[in-house]
């Protein structure tokens, strides 16, 4: 029997209610549905509303891979009146009062559930939070254990980290809302992006090895862990986003610690955290960032997913990546409408150029192929940097929307190659005509000496006669 707590009223945006109305019937028909919405759009709210409103599900299992996501989902579900228990070894130690094995909805760590089993028989609905991870063995093992369950995937980036699609598991994809719609309604803020150190990082990554679809730690370290580049990370953060809370994404733990140290030497309160940071220290550091006693937190793959600070003013991407999904998740941390009006992204990894991604644009995802095909950045570039302020702007922009500077006429690599080829043809033709004229003069001299007519001269010039002696 479903038991509900007294419900708390939530502000339901129209697209959230539309999503709930569509997803319930779609899950009944297609069984495995991938729901896509931008970071900060309220995917957890939409999933929770769906569970609270659809009555056919007697047993529900919500899976996430981080305690922050588990706590977020549990809170949303309880606020909507859903009886909810938690199954996560680490979370249970911190909040034993939230363990309720009899609750019909269990929010759990994918690792814990995979190890223990869900403690629920005949699960009717499984929710995969951050569903771009759905092809991992842990998620697949849980889905296999409940073959009759409907599966809802929630993600902002419907592809694996290597860019491949999720069509091997999900049967249909539903884009619930697009970034452009949320910017138009001021639910999200489109960030201003600045490109720094692009040429040097690009050179450092030529021929760099990859693993799992992204650069290896060693190749990233060689490209960006340099004193000059680290110093520039600090200088540009001070210049472009002074005084606002910032998160820095570093290449390695050592790289992150060096950046934090350089910030502190510049008189800016900064801290480092990584996967080995204790839960207590991590909470303390993030609380300090939230209350303003800390301005910068440097990290390595910790604050990429499942963490939000609406007051965040800037993200500094001090690492390269080949993964559009990873890049979008880093940028997504700074798109919430709360906090500073100007939201800043500083890209020190040449990522937007490499991936031809304009932060905030709508992406044409597909279920089968994941990331859309991107044009060659050298042949068909989509973006450039302002000649005055270094803000990233569209390739066709004649004026920078940030500083107003007039931009020189941009030429694509293809246009440049065409012009070079045309110039080469012109030069070759000029050389050819010069040689023909020299040959004509010599032939005319010989014809005059030998009493030959001009037809002989033309035949020599056209190559029909032996060379002129």
Label each PLM-derived region with a short phrase:
Residues 132-193:
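Post-DEXD/H (motif II) to motif III coupling segment of the RecA-like Helicase ATP-binding lobe
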Residues 334-360:
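Conserved segment of the helicase C-terminal RecA-like domain
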């Amino acid at each position: 029997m479903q038991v509900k707590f007294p419900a708390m009223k939530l502000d339901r945006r129209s697209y959230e209610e539309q999503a709930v109305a569509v997803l319930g019937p779609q899950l009944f028909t297609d069984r495995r549905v991938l729901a896509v919405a931008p970071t900060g759009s309220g995917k957890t709210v939409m999933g929770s509303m769906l569970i609270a409103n659809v009555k056919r599900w007697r047993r529900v299992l919500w899976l996430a891979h981080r305690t922050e996501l588990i706590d977020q989902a549990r809170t949303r579900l309880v606020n909507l009146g859903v009886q909810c228990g938690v199954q996560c070894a680490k979370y249970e130690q911190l909040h034993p009062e939230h363990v309720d094995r009899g609750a019909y909805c269990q929010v759990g760590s994918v690792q814990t559930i995979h190890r223990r089993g869900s403690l629920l028989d005949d699960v009717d609905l499984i929710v995969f939070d951050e569903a771009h991870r759905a092809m991992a063995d842990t998620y697949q093992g849980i889905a296999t254990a409940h073959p009759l369950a409907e599966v809802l995937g929630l993600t902002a980036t419907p592809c694996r980290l290597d860019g491949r699609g999720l069509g091997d598991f999900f049967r249909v994809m539903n884009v619930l809302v697009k970034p452009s719609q949320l910017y138009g309604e001021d639910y999200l803020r489109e960030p201003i992006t600045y490109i720094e150190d692009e040429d040097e990082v690009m050179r450092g990554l030529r021929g760099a090895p990859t693993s799992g679809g992204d650069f290896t730690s060693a190749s990233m370290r060689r490209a960006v862990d340099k004193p000059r580049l680290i110093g520039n990370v600090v200088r540009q953060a001070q210049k472009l986003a002074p005084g606002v809370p910032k998160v820095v994404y570093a290449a390695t733990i050592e790289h992150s610690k060096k950046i934090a140290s350089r910030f502190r030497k510049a008189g800016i309160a900064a801290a480092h955290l990584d996967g080995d940071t204790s839960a207590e220290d991590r909470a303390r550091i993030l609380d300090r960032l939230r209350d303003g006693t800390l301005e910068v937190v440097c990290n390595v793959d910790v604050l990429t997913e499942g963490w939000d600070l609406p007051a965040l003013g800037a993200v500094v991407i001090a690492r390269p990546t080949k993964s559009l999904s990873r890049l979008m998740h880093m940028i997504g941390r700074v798109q919430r409408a709360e906090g500073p009006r100007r939201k800043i992204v500083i890209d020190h990894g040449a990522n937007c150029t490499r991936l031809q991604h304009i932060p905030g644009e709508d992406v044409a995802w597909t279920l089968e192929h994941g990331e859309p095909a991107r044009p060659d950045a050298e042949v068909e570039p989509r973006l450039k940097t302002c000649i005055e302020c270094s803000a990233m702007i569209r390739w066709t922009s004649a004026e920078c929307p940030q500083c107003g500077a007039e931009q020189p006429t941009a030429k694509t690599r293809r246009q440049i190659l065409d012009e070079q080829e045309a110039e080469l043809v012109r030069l070759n033709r000029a050389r050819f005509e010069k040689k023909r004229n020299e040959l004509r003069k010599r032939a005319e001299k010989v014809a005059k000496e030998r009493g030959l007519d001009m037809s002989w001269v033309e035949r020599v010039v056209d190559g029909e006669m032996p060379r002129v002696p």
